[in-house]
């Protein structure tokens, strides 16, 4: 074995059953496991063994040994005896091989050798100093006397007691806590004897060569395996000599024989526990004498046999990739009493042969599907007479699977014969699917029970395995088992291990992608309270004390629905087992004082949610997927003494076992009437068992003790009844996607309010409120998302490649939300593209989600936010004053930030106190600035939601980073630059950020710079460092001078800004920022650069505060420009800015990453009020806000200088005062120097612009604004609007009274940028902040607030489920405060929504953007909309920050959305920007008109998309970063960033700013540019999700990668949807939770799905929502459910959805709504706003559906192709000149044909629209080719063809939906809901 052994070992590890070898290194892995052999060496691990003996360790403590031996010694003795005993043929016989036995006893280390036992001390017990020799002799002595049984039994008791032991290291500890051992611990009570023992006998042979220093090799042979000729070698020491192996083999054989012959004996906890429960556990330690080792030169026959057997075994197990066993230490370090995770890692249970058998067997005959498998396990009675008595009345025939029961009364229990004779009663015979006799091993039970169920689950059906029986019959042991050895593992750990093996095998065989999530819930106590056992380990868990936690809701359609439970992603079996350990530890029965009653009434439901995505080979390529669940239920015995009496009355008391049996029978039978239907346990069982397609297995436990005959009979009878009946299809049964539940079915059945997707959103969803069941908002039973399939269609219907869809199964190391960021990571290279590249929506969502920190990679779901938030919150709260005066805060925020940072002094200038509040580390912007805005958010962020555990740590870092930057200025940031939580773009950003640190400050300074500058809003959605939450979704608002942008469409200005910012680098790397960045592609490019600097700065900021970091980052970028010019390195206003931002939007920042931007805007906002600042109403003020914290520090001079610099470098048409106002407001006014200079700072300006800035500062400003939330919302809206109109109208829309006088859109290149002056003023700024911040983190607050609100409101049942804590969803977290929702409703939010919706329309109601005239743009005044939005926003905030408008109204809530809004401004450069605009337009209008949150982005279900969904058409991804979530951000970011060629697109852009149209166009061109230039940056589609599950989890992510062609620009529809945060409730689809980059999806898909719920691509929810939306405009919220029905965006979506619904496109929902062909449209399409934009005022429902229809699914690749990176495009053109010439003629001809067709289609569309009662020409602009394109160019032709194709599709859709839409149109009155005039911008 030595030589061969090595190979065997290698192979074996997979099998490694026992890793008893305590061999230090080699066997370490195993050693911990194998406590049996654990020798002194093992001791370290030995502790493990102790736990095994669960009692063993503890026993040490008690000196219960014979003659004063401690318990531990007793255990050792028992083990020694057992080992010896097993080697003897019979009780009285002597050891078969005396030499061997002697050797064994001689060398055998004490079974439970204490860790303390070291080689020397090994022999002596530390506790009682008993020498091992004594024990050995005693064992030998006992061996001679066949009393071993009693001895063995006796130890049982001891071991049971042992659990308390703490002596053994982790092992023991686990034992005591022993969830596993303990659970089975019940087993302890159930049966002391074999708690740890495997039911079946197994032999463990430890071979320790004398010369090897005690290294042991343990071979574990299970009896069953022995019989089958299979040997499982847990670990073979490669050094063992063949002789040893031979001896071991001999011993093993002997033992095997014995084992088979002997009845299982409860072994001492020590070693035997690992083995069969009652089964014989043989542990032989074979230690050849020193001489023998050398002496045996050749392997003996036995050795040869053994080796051969091992080799065969190894071959058999080759399939399984062994996990390299971690050092034993790993095992020993379990945090919980049990360590199943360690066991599965080191010694995964060997998979039963039937598990991986032919797939054909996977699908059982239809006949057996409805049947419930019932298995009977007979638990041996304790005592020597057990077998005899058992035989007397119980006969088992395992082969026939029958059990015969005799009446014990008939005869003496001892004599079966006499009894039989005397028995008058006929014996009762019962048949089952399997019968496990007393000596059955645990492994037998597991393999016989789990295999078929697992296959069903992997095949897409639900599965359920539960134990049933009276007390102390081993139910828990069967289900949980013990972690002592692989043989003692129960069904749950085995199921976990095998499920992953099966998934792995299935993945390899079919390419299916899997994602597994785990949830664990317990029903316990007399009150039947429901507990989420994983709440404590849930990354963003808010449940703790403040959250209502998990609850059950009765759904008339879907039955019981479990809501709000934590559903944690488990990429590996070890992780899932870790959650099992955590659940067991959290279970009430594991508590010290747990009494028998508690145990009886404790029922644990452990669920594995399996999401899978398959490539569909048929027809159009696509992916289909579904979710299936495996419920593993450990039912208590329910026999509470009081329970029986109360149970009859149906009281809350525990059900009796018989009552429970009746319930199970009824559920399994599908009976209409279920007894005790209101009992929580019944509801829980219904949720898991009642699914018609659920493969259920029941394991009934009975005792073979005659004394329990009555109980046994009743249990057997019930089990037999269940076995006989066939499951009827219950109408409520299909709660899960399980076999029958299909998307349509589940969705149709499940009321919209039940839509899982939005658990939180739902809570926010106003529509849902009435219908919502108690848990509605959070409702997301695992079954809720049970739609089975999600289909992803490639561009043009082409199949997506597996890689594209699955991302090669491997989660990207880094998922930059913004591709540009990804680019930043040069080292990554092409990989960057992969990072973001998520093959599927689900994957992307997952990743984004992760990034969000929701799940964890990012530092904690919502973790970043949470983490930061928590510190910030703490800090934030301190500055209530700031909070108190939001507006004041606006000005103050900057000051506030100062305190935060070293630059505080400067910052203080504005409002020192707020600054203080802003200090990230101490007080997140919690303080005053955000009180209003933040209050909700704050509540959510700081107080409302508890800091997420994971995120919390990062925030400090962030803070540190922020601070560092503050102090050192740029440098600090560098060092501190946050690293993205998981491989988020943050990393990239980190570097770039560094350089930009100074610049960003500068940028911030210039934030309010000139209106002339274009405002580039860069929303970096990268989890800035730790801020997973922040994800950096920094909305960088940069105002670039047009000139600067113009050059090459690249951020030439940026370059001019300053190398200091490394803007160039940023430009390339930060492109993502660009995405959000500007209306102009140039801006985009510019932004890219700036963002880099910004990001660095931002990173620093991020360090300081998530939101702030974004904001600061933006500001920094802005400042960057200014800063670079102005060497003065303010401590980087990062900190200050942050502070400033924070003050303005610190709460947002704190609460959410987005907040950072918000914070930034906050200053802007303050700036907006900035006029408040005074220096320059717009410019200086803007500047100040831009760098609220830092800049102010810099002081006017710095600002002035920066502003000037920026100005000069970014000469731009100065925006009118409007911009100035807004910017000024934004700027603390700290830089009194002319607003002209710094204000023009692109970032600042942007903020001022209201879009981006508003987004970034919106939050901060919000507080500043009269209504904290409103300003933010407004900002968001403004952003969106801006995007829409391409003007700053959004700013106007922002509540700011001073409407932002929008400067006519600047042209980016040929395109007119819809840049408005920062007129938005502070109102706008806040809005922008909202958008930006909202994107990041603000949203969480809102969301949270919303969610809770929704939770309360939505649940119509009145049985208000406990207010569901907002799930971890980043968004939600970001919007954490429950209060946020109300705030969200704040005008700011509403305003923002309105702005988005109103598209540039100054919403009088909001801030009366009196200042903004929409003059320059064609923005329609959407004042009324603002109001509506406002109103809507309130609701919307409840939603998912669905629309930008929504988000703005939500303020923080709009984190995702806000970014969208942010992009709005930078739409041209970044689709997202446009997206927000269109969304704004349509969404805003809707939002305003109707409370729906239709605002663009409203649909974006994911925050990431922020407005992405609403932005749908406008490449959400453009700023995915806009997406409030960094997760989404990265996606969008990449897409937007890639648009390096904005200039190209811009060129084509129309000179005229049609307002929304232009924005759309810009977005479109932006998309093209992205494809052209952005793609490269992206590295193709570098959308890896940083935190994809394992490969499985990554799930399908329609990859941006799919269009890796060229630049892999994000599809025009690309929008990054913020990952939905199912938050604590299972989302039906993994994708549901993941963020989606709509662009990633095929055009059609992307557009449709994205539009519908651009970020929500859970196929299910979104579908469902869509259908609901279809129902009516008012139903929009429902349809928005997914994203947050309440949000305007949602509304918008719902409007769209009507069409979908009519179409029956429920499924489509998964897919991003197809956006109008961005390519075809040129830029316009890219803007989600495009479609939303076009018909903003339109009745939400009508236009939205249309838009959906309109969306043509552009071929992403095509888009990419026609839109090479701007830089690329020119080159391409040059290179292809000759080709073009050659093709010119042909092209011209084709062009004429296409134009003719296009014209014809336009006419048809107009006619159809008339029938649909839509405004004629409503979407036409979507189908127009970007004017920037050369009509002669192939690109133009391609774009035209795409546009035509999209138009054709739109026409067809419209025609197909004429009737349906017409119906909805009739109720379009929804628009009436929008107060104020509704205008359609097209």
UniProtKB/Swiss-Prot annotation:
Its main location: cytoplasm. PROSITE patterns: KINESIN_MOTOR_2. The keyword Lipid metabolism does not apply. The modification Phosphoserine is found at residues 31, 885, 1262, 1662. Residues 899-910, 1624-1637 have a biased composition (Polar residues). Residues 1-66, 149-201, 316-337, 729-785, 851-915, 940-993, 1121-1237, 1335-1728 are annotated as: Disordered. Residues 165-187, 732-741, 1135-1152, 1532-1546, 1672-1685 have a biased composition (Low complexity). Residues 1784-1812 form a coiled coil. Residues 1397-1412 have a biased composition (Basic and acidic residues). Residues 749-758, 1693-1710 have a biased composition (Basic residues). The keyword Chloroplast does not apply. InterPro entries: Kinesin-like_fam (IPR027640), Kinesin_motor_dom (IPR001752), Kinesin_motor_dom_sf (IPR036961), P-loop_NTPase (IPR027417). Changing residue 721 to C: In CDCBM11; uncertain significance; results in increased microtubule depolymerization. Residues 948-957 have a biased composition (Pro residues). Residues 54-66, 856-865, 1495-1505 have a biased composition (Gly residues). Disulfide bonds: none annotated. This is Kinesin-like protein KIF26A. The lineage of its organism: Eukaryota, Metazoa, Chordata, Craniata, Vertebrata.
């Amino acid at each position: 074995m030595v030589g061969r052994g090595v190979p065997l070992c290698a192979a074996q590890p997979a099998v490694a059953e026992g890793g008893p070898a305590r061999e230090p290194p080699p066997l370490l892995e195993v050693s911990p496991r194998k406590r049996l052999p654990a020798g002194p060496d093992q001791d370290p691990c030995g502790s493990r063994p102790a736990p095994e003996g669960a009692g063993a360790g503890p026993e040490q403590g008690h000196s219960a040994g014979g003659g004063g031996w401690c318990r531990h010694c007793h255990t050792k003795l028992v083990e020694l005896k057992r080992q010896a005993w097993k080697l003897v043929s019979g009780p009285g016989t002597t050891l078969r091989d005396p030499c061997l036995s002697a050797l064994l006893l001689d060398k055998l280390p004490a079974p439970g050798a204490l860790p303390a036992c070291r080689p020397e001390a090994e022999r002596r017990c530390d506790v009682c100093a008993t020498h091992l020799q004594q024990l050995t002799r005693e064992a030998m002595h006992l061996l001679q006397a066949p009393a071993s049984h009693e001895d063995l039994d006796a130890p049982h008791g001891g071991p049971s007691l042992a659990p308390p032991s703490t002596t053994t290291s982790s092992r023991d500890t686990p034992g005591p806590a022993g969830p596993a051992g303990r659970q089975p611990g019940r087993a302890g009570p159930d049966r002391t004897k074999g708690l740890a023992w495997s039911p079946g006998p197994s032999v463990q042979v430890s071979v320790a060569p004398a010369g090897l220093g005690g290294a042991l090799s343990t071979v574990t042979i299970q009896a069953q395996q022995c019989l089958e000729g299979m040997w499982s070698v847990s670990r073979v020491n490669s050094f063992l000599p063949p002789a040893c192996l031979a001896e071991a083999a001999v011993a093993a054989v002997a033992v095997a024989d014995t084992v088979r012959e002997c009845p299982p004996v409860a072994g001492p906890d020590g070693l035997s526990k690992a083995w069969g429960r009652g089964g014989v556990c043989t542990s032989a330690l074979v230690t050849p004498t020193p001489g023998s080792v050398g002496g045996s030169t050749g392997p003996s026959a036995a050795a040869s046999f053994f080796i051969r057997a091992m080799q065969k075994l190894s071959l058999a197990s080759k399939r399984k990739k062994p996990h390299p066993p971690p050092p034993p230490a790993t095992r020993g370090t379990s945090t919980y009493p049990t360590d199943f995770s360690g066991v599965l890692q080191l010694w995964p249970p060997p998979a039963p042969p039937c598990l991986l058998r032919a797939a054909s067997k996977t699908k059982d005959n239809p006949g057996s599907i409805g049947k419930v498998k019932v298995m009977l396990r007979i638990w041996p009675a304790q005592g020597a007479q057990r077998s005899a008595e058992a035989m007397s009345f119980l006969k088992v025939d395992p082969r026939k699977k029958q059990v015969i029961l005799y009446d014990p009364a008939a005869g003496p229990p001892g004599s079966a014969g006499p009894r039989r004779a005397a028995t008058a009663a006929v014996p009762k015979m019962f048949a089952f699917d399997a019968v496990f006799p007393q000596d059955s091993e645990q492994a037998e039970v597991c393999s016989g029970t789990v295999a078929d169920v697992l296959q069903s689950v992997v095949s897409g059906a639900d599965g359920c395995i539960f134990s049933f029986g009276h007390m102390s019959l081993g139910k828990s042991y069967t289900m949980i088992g013990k972690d002592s050895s692989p043989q003692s593992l129960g069904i749950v750990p085995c199921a976990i291990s095998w499920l992953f093996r099966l998934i792995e095998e299935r993945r390899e065989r079919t390419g299916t992608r899997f994602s597994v999530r785990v949830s664990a819930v317990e029903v316990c106590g007399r009150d039947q309270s429901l507990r989420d056992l994983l709440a404590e380990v849930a990354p963003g868990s808010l449940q703790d004390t403040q959250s209502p936690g998990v609850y059950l809701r009765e759904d008339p359609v879907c039955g019981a629905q479990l809501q709000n439970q934590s559903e944690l992603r488990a990429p590996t079996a070890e992780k899932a087992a870790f959650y099992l350990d955590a659940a067991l530890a959290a279970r009430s029965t594991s508590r010290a004082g747990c009494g028998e009653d508690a145990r009886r009434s404790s029922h644990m439901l452990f669920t594995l949610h399996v999401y899978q995505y398959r490539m569909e080979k048929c027809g159009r390529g696509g992916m289909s997927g579904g979710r299936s669940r495996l419920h593993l239920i450990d039912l208590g015995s329910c026999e509470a003494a009081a329970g029986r009496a109360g149970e009859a009355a149906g009281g809350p008391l525990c059900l009796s076992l018989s009552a429970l049996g009746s319930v199970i029978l009824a559920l399994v039978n599908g009976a209409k009437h279920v007894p005790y239907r209101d009992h929580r346990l019944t509801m829980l069982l219904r949720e898991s068992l009642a699914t018609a397609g659920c493969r259920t297995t029941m394991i009934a436990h009975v005792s073979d003790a005659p004394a329990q005959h009555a109980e046994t009979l009743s249990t057997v009878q019930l089990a037999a009844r269940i076995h006989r009946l066939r499951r009827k299809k219950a109408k409520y049964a299909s709660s899960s996607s399980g076999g029958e539940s299909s998307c349509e079915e589940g969705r149709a059945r499940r009321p919209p309010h039940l839509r899982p997707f939005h658990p939180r959103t739902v809570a926010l969803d106003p529509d849902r409120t009435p219908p919502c069941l108690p848990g509605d908002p959070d409702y997301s039973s695992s079954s809720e998302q049970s739609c089975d399939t999600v289909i992803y269609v490639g561009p043009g219907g082409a199949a997506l490649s597996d890689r594209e869809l699955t991302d090669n199964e491997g989660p990207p190391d880094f998922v930059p939300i913004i591709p540009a960021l990804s680019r930043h990571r040069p080292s990554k290279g092409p990989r960057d593209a992969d990072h973001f590249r998520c093959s599927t929506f689900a994957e992307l969502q997952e990743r984004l989600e992760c990034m969000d920190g929701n799940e964890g990679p990012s530092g904690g779901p919502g973790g970043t936010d949470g983490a930061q938030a928590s510190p910030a919150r703490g800090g934030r709260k301190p500055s209530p004053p700031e909070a108190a005066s939001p507006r004041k805060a606006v000005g103050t925020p900057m000051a506030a930030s100062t305190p935060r940072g070293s630059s505080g002094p400067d910052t203080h200038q504005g409002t020192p106190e707020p600054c203080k509040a802003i200090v990230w580390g101490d007080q997140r912007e919690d303080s005053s600035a955000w009180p209003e805005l933040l209050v909700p958010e704050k509540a959510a962020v700081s107080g409302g939601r508890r800091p997420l555990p994971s995120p919390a740590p990062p925030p400090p870092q962030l803070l540190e980073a922020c601070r560092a930057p503050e102090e050192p200025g740029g440098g600090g940031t560098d060092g501190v630059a946050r690293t993205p939580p998981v491989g988020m773009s943050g990393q990239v950003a980190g570097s770039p950020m560094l350089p930009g640190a100074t610049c960003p400050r500068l940028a911030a300074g210039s934030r309010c710079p000139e209106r002339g500058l274009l405002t580039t809003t860069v929303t970096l959605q990268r989890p800035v460092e730790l801020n997973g939450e922040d994800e950096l979704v920094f909305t960088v608002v940069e105002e670039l001078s047009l000139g600067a942008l113009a050059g090459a469409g690249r951020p030439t200005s940026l370059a001019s800004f300053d190398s200091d910012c490394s803007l160039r680098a940023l430009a390339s790397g930060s492109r993502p920022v660009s995405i959000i960045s500007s209306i102009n592609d140039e801006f985009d490019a510019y932004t890219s650069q700036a963002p880099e600097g910004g990001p660095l700065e931002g990173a620093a900021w991020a360090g300081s505060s998530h939101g702030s970091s974004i904001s600061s980052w933006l500001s920094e970028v802005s400042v960057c420009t200014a800063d670079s010019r102005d060497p003065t390195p303010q401590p980087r206003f990062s900190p200050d800015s942050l502070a400033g931002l924070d003050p303005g939007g610190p709460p947002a920042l704190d609460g959410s990453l987005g907040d950072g931007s918000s914070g930034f805007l906050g200053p802007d906002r303050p700036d907006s009020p900035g006029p408040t600042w005074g220096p320059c109403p717009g410019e200086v003020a803007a500047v100040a806000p831009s760098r609220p914290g830092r800049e102010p520090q810099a002081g006017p001079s710095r600002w002035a200088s920066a502003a000037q610099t920026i100005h000069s470098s970014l000469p731009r048409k100065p925006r009118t005062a409007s911009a100035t106002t807004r910017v000024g407001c934004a700027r603390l006014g700290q830089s009194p120097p002319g607003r002209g200079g710094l204000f023009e700072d692109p970032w600042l300006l942007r903020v001022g612009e209201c879009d981006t800035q508003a987004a970034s500062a919106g939050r901060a400003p919000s507080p500043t604004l009269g209504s904290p939330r409103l300003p933010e919302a407004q900002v968001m809206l403004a952003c969106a609007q801006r995007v829409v109109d391409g003007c700053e109208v959004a700013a106007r829309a922002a509540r700011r009274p001073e409407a932002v006088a929008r400067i006519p859109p600047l042209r980016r290149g040929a395109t007119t940028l819809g840049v408005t002056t920062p007129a938005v003023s502070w109102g706008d700024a806040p809005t922008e902040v909202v958008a930006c911040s909202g994107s990041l983190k603000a949203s969480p607050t809102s969301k949270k607030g919303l969610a809770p609100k929704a939770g309360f409101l939505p649940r119509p049942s009145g049985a208000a489920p406990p207010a569901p804590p907002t799930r971890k969803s980043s968004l939600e977290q970001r919007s954490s405060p429950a209060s946020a929702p109300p705030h969200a409703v704040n005008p700011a939010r509403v305003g923002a929504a309105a702005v988005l919706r109103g598209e540039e329309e100054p919403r009088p109601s909001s801030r009366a953007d009196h200042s903004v005239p929409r003059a320059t743009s064609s923005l329609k005044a959407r004042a009324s909309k603002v109001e509506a939005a406002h109103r809507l926003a309130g609701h919307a905030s409840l939603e998912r920050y669905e629309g930008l408008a929504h988000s703005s109204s939500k303020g923080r809530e709009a984190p995702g959305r806000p970014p969208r809004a942010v992009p709005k401004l930078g739409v041209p450069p970044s689709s997202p920007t446009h997206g927000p605009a269109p969304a704004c337009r349509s969404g805003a209008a809707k939002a305003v008109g109707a409370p729906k949150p239709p605002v663009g982005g409203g649909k974006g279900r994911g925050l990431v998309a922020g407005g992405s969904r609403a932005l749908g058409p406008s490449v959400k991804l453009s700023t995915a970063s806009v997406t409030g979530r960094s997760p989404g951000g990265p996606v969008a970011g990449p897409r937007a960033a890639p648009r390096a060629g904005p200039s190209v697109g811009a060129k084509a852009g129309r000179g005229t700013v049609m307002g929304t149209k232009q924005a759309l166009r810009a977005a479109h061109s932006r998309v093209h540019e992205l494809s052209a230039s952005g793609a490269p940056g992206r590295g193709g589609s570098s959308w890896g999700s940083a935190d994809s599950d394992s490969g499985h989890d990554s799930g399908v992510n329609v990859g941006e990668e799919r269009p890796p062609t060229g630049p892999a620009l994000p599809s025009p529809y690309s929008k990054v949807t913020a990952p939905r945060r199912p938050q604590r409730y299972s989302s039906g689809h993994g994708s549901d939770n993941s963020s989606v980059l709509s662009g990633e999806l095929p055009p059609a898909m992307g557009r449709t799905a994205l539009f519908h719920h651009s970020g929500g691509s859970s196929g299910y929810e979104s579908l469902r929502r869509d259908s609901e939306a279809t129902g009516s405009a008012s139903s929009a919220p429902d349809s928005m459910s997914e994203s947050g029905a309440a949000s305007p965006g949602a509304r918008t979506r719902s409007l769209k959805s009507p069409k979908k619904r009519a179409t029956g496109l429920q499924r489509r929902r998964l897919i991003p709504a197809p956006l109008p062909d961005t390519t075809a449209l040129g830029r316009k399409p890219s803007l989600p706003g495009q479609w939303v934009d076009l018909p903003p005022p339109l009745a939400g429902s009508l236009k939205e559906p249309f838009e959906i229809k309109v969306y043509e699914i552009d071929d992403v690749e095509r888009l990419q192709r026609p839109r090479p990176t701007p830089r690329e495009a020119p080159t391409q053109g040059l290179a292809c000149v000759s080709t073009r010439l050659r093709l010119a003629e042909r092209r011209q001809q084709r062009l004429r044909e296409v134009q003719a067709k296009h014209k014809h289609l336009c006419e048809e569309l107009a006619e159809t629209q008339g029938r649909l009662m839509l405004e004629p020409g409503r979407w036409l602009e979507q189908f127009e080719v970007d004017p920037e394109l050369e009509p002669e160019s192939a690109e133009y032709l391609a774009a035209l063809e795409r546009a035509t194709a999209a138009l054709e599709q739109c026409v067809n859709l419209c025609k197909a939906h004429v009737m349906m839409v017409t119906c909805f149109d009739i109720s379009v009155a929804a628009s009436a809901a929008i107060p104020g005039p509704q205008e359609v911008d097209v």
